[in-house]
């Protein structure tokens, strides 16, 4: 039996990152809404509890509290951001509105030699104070410590940025240790989970495979499953996992909606029919999809339409399978949280995902989402453990709506053709260009990354079609053609991301090739936006 961490979600967009960090420490955890019953908390029997952040205010929303059982169990508790504030309020402290709200990078001074922060620091001040580089996101602040607590961290604008009652194992921080922007955040969470809570690091991917296979078999029984195969990492790993569980009860439906990458259909059929020996039905539905997208410019509507058409195609195929009762999808955690579809339903919706937002309530098939609680890097790890080839597992993510969300505004077949060719050139150049010692010296990559392709050094890269024209000169003639933007990001979890600092020579080659080889394009720009504030996809 694995030790378990209970994460209570108050509605933060990054609650799932807490789970990711706990799992990186090889400790099992589950996320549940903050308003679960006291009986649930006791029956879960956690070794420790973590309280997440929230977009709410502790003194405006008096219902958003942790169950009393959290404080009665006698296990360590870690409060993060809002979790710190509700801990303070519920245990007799004081929270008030801050005159100076903090959103973004901050430097926090550590105090008091607590077990949580002992020997963890990023730098020291000339006065010898240990400092932490962290990520803040709060409008309220703790103004008075609860009885039994001592100060653990502070900033000039947030005098109580961390507090601890070590006798009871209660710790709280105003910043977010779960995000990558907090330099020592992973170390702090490991200290809490392994050191303070005493959890055994014995949860590994092979355990997850066994549990997932058993769960799929229990859910599905002898019924049949259809899965929408896109060729992307998520649907590929979902197909492999489900195929391991139920074999030929799974039928993969590969839908060509006219918005796929170059040569996608050929690659998908070779991989799944040739390698996995899975049942794959190939459907060309490009006319159907493009017809319904004609004249539609709103990105939310495009996603909804693509999701709806996918469902209709699946339902039509399911009718041919007498025992098909399940629709499987490669939905992963970032899809769910960006759609406001976490287990708590409290996260603010950023955009609809075709996997979750596009499904009608009247869907005639039950939904099977075996990757719903996994992050992208976990999905890749799972794929390797399932024996999938590296070229499949480490392929860059591709959204279910395909080029439909990479063509701004109305989707047209000729726009898709232009974008497909530009995107293929960009990816080809990334694959064949290796990082050099000069790149490392310039700070574009780490020294141990020299010799790796820039495709492998980026987490996701693609081209975006902009439906605007600009003036250009080709030879002796004037051109008036379309623009494409190149986008490349680096991230570990896809919840936050940095734009990739690619070598200028590489970007120059991409631009020259695209303009010279793709008739109809005469300008190439590079996107230097991070996430946040931008999302990775443009729509």
From Swiss-Prot:
Catalysed reactions, semicolon-separated: XMP + L-glutamine + ATP + H2O = GMP + L-glutamate + AMP + diphosphate + 2 H(+)
Annotated ATP binding sites: 230-236
EC number: 6.3.5.2
Active-site residues per Swiss-Prot or TrEMBL entry: 81 (nucleophile), 176, 178
The GMPS ATP-PPase domain, residue ranges: 203-395
Highest taxon above the source species: Bacteria
A molecular function GO annotation: GMP synthase activity
Pfam families on file: GATase, GMP_synt_C, NAD_synthase
Keywords: ATP-binding, Glutamine amidotransferase, GMP biosynthesis, Ligase, Nucleotide-binding, Purine biosynthesis
Top-level enzyme category: ligase
The keyword Iron is assigned to this record: no
InterPro entries, A to Z: Class_I_gatase-like, GATASE, GMP_synth_C, GMP_synth_GATase, GMP_synthase, GMPS_ATP_PPase_dom, NAD/GMP_synthase, Rossmann-like_a/b/a_fold
Gene Ontology cellular component terms for the protein in this record: cytosol
Every Glutamine amidotransferase type-1 domain range: 4-202
UniProt entry tagged with the keyword Transmembrane helix: no
Pathway involvement of the protein, from the record: Purine metabolism; GMP biosynthesis; GMP from XMP (L-Gln route): step 1/1
Function: Catalyzes the synthesis of GMP from XMP.
Assembly with partners or alone: Homodimer.
Protein name per Swiss-Prot or TrEMBL: GMP synthase [glutamine-hydrolyzing]
Native species: Cupriavidus necator (strain ATCC 17699 / DSM 428 / KCTC 22496 / NCIMB 10442 / H16 / Stanier 337)
């Amino acid at each position: 039996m694995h030790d378990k961490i209970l994460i209570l979600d108050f509605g933060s967009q990054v609650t799932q990152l807490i789970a990711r960090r706990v799992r990186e420490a090889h400790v099992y955890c589950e996320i549940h809404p903050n308003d679960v019953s006291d009986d649930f908390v006791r029956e879960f029997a956690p070794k420790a509890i973590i309280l997440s952040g929230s977009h709410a205010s502790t003194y405006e929303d008096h219902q958003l509290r942790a169950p009393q059982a959290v404080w009665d169990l006698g296990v360590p508790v870690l409060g993060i951001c809002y979790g710190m504030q509700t801990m303070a309020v519920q245990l007799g402290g004081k929270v008030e509105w801050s005159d100076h709200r903090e959103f973004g990078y901050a430097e926090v001074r550590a105090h008091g030699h607590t077990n949580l922060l002992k020997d963890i620091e990023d730098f020291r001040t000339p006065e010898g104070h240990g400092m932490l580089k962290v990520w803040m996101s709060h409008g309220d602040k703790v103004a008075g410590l609860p009885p039994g607590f001592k100060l653990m961290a502070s900033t000039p604008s947030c005098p109580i940025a961390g507090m601890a009652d070590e006798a009871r194992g209660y710790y709280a921080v105003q910043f977010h240790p779960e995000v990558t922007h907090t330099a020592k955040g992973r170390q702090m969470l490991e200290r809490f989970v392994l050191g303070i809570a005493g959890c055994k690091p014995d949860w590994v991917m092979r355990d997850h495979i066994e549990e997932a296979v058993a769960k799929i078999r229990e859910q599905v029984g002898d019924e049949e499953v259809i899965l929408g195969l896109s060729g992307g990492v998520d649907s590929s790993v979902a197909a492999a996992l489900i195929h391991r569980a139920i074999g030929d009860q799974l039928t993969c439906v590969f839908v060509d909606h006219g918005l796929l990458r170059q040569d996608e259909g050929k690659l998908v059929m070779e991989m799944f029919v040739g390698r996995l020996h899975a049942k794959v039905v190939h459907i060309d539905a490009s006319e159907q999809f493009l017809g319904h997208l004609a004249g539609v410019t709103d990105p939310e509507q495009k996603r909804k339409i693509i999701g709806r058409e996918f469902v209709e195609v699946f339902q039509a195929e399911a009718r041919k399978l007498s025992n098909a009762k399940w629709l499987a999808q490669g939905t992963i955690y970032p899809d769910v949280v960006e759609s406001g579809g976490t287990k708590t339903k409290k996260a603010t919706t950023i955009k609809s995902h075709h996997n979750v937002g596009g499904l009608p309530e009247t869907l005639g098939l039950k939904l099977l989402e075996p990757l719903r609680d996994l992050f992208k890097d976990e999905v890749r790890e799972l794929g390797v453990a399932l024996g999938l080839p590296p070229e499949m597992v480490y392929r860059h993510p591709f959204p279910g709506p395909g080029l439909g969300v990479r063509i701004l505004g109305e989707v047209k077949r000729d726009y898709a053709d232009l974008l497909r060719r530009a995107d293929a050139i960009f990816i080809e150049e990334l694959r064949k260009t290796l990082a050099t010692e000069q790149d490392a010296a310039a700070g574009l990559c780490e020294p141990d990354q020299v010799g790796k392709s820039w495709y492998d050094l980026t987490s996701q890269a693609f081209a975006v079609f902009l439906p605007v024209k600009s003036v250009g000169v080709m030879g002796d003639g004037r051109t008036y053609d379309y623009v494409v933007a190149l986008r490349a990001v680096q991230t570990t979890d896809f919840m936050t991301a940095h734009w990739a600092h690619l070598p200028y020579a590489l970007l120059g080659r991409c631009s020259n090739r695209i303009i010279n080889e793709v008739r109809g394009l005469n300008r190439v720009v590079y996107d230097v936006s991070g996430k946040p504030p931008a999302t990775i996809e443009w729509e």
